[in-house]
């Protein structure tokens, strides 16, 4: 399998249907806690615009590598600007008070070099005293929830299955998605996509953040700012600052 960056071109059509139970309110609580007085924000991997649309910030920009996602976001959220771009090499020619990358976006950085490039890009696009917030899957989650597990979901118009297969690299996973979208009456159209994710050890993330120029302000797990990183957490959060 090649490590092409997944673009969610087909899944974007049903993305919101199967993310309606995602705890976006918890991400928003964290963003608002650390960004009480921000005047500009950049969302890396902004998807269909759910997070930015919920924020009351004067200047809001989102980037995503899926043009279909960007088009949907533009329709959903006229209060923000959205661009199709690569998180490892974007250049927007402006800087922001806050940058966010929610819902394990950084796990789509296919290797440590790509992960470091995202951090360096974020640093370059932050104002002085700016904050970068992101989360990643934990080692525990990669080894348990994504260890040949099969998931499925459906509603009246869509059915999909999601097979997880551990990748060749340590702490990596292939997501094989198959979904059927109703087009009329009993006629369904089948789509298939394969996505690759890689997570990174806490010590490696700290090193890459330091190399990018960041100060590590805080780290915690599972949406609780008072919850230290633990071996059985599912999602780790990082709050980085450009001083």
Q: Could you tell me what each predicted segment is?
A:
Residues 1-47:
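Conserved class I S-adenosyl-L-methionine
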Residues 97-113:
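A short SAM/SAH-binding and catalytic strip from SAM-dependent methyltransferases
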Residues 116-128:
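A short glycine-rich, Lys/Arg-flanked "PGG" loop and its adjoining helix->strand segment in the class I
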Residues 133-206:
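SAM-dependent methyltransferase
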């Amino acid at each position: 399998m090649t490590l092409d960056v997944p673009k969610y071109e087909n899944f974007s059509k049903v993305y919101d249907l199967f993310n309606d139970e995602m705890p976006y309110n918890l991400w928003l609580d964290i963003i608002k806690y650390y960004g009480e007085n921000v005047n500009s924000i950049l969302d890396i991997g902004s998807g269909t615009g759910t997070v930015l649309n919920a924020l009351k910030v004067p200047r809001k920009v989102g980037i995503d590598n899926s043009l279909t996602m960007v088009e949907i976001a533009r329709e959903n959220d006229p209060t923000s600007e959205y661009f199709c771009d690569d998180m490892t090499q974007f250049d927007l020619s402006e800087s922001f008070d806050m940058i966010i990358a929610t819902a394990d976006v950084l796990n789509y950085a296919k290797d440590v070099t790509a992960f470091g490039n995202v951090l360096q890009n974020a640093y370059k696009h932050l104002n002085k005293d700016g904050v970068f917030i992101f989360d990643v899957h934990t080692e525990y989650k990669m080894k348990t929830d994504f260890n040949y597990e099969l998931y499925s979901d459906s509603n009246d118009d869509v059915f999909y299955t999601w097979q997880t297969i551990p990748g060749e690299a340590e702490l990596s996973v292939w997501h094989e998605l198959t979904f059927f979208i109703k087009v009329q009456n009993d006629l369904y159209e089948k789509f298939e996509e394969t996505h690759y994710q890689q997570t990174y050890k806490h010590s490696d993330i700290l090193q890459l953040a330091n190399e990018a120029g960041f100060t590590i302000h805080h780290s915690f797990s599972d949406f609780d700012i008072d919850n230290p990183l633990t071996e059985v957490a599912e999602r780790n959060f990082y709050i980085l600052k450009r001083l």
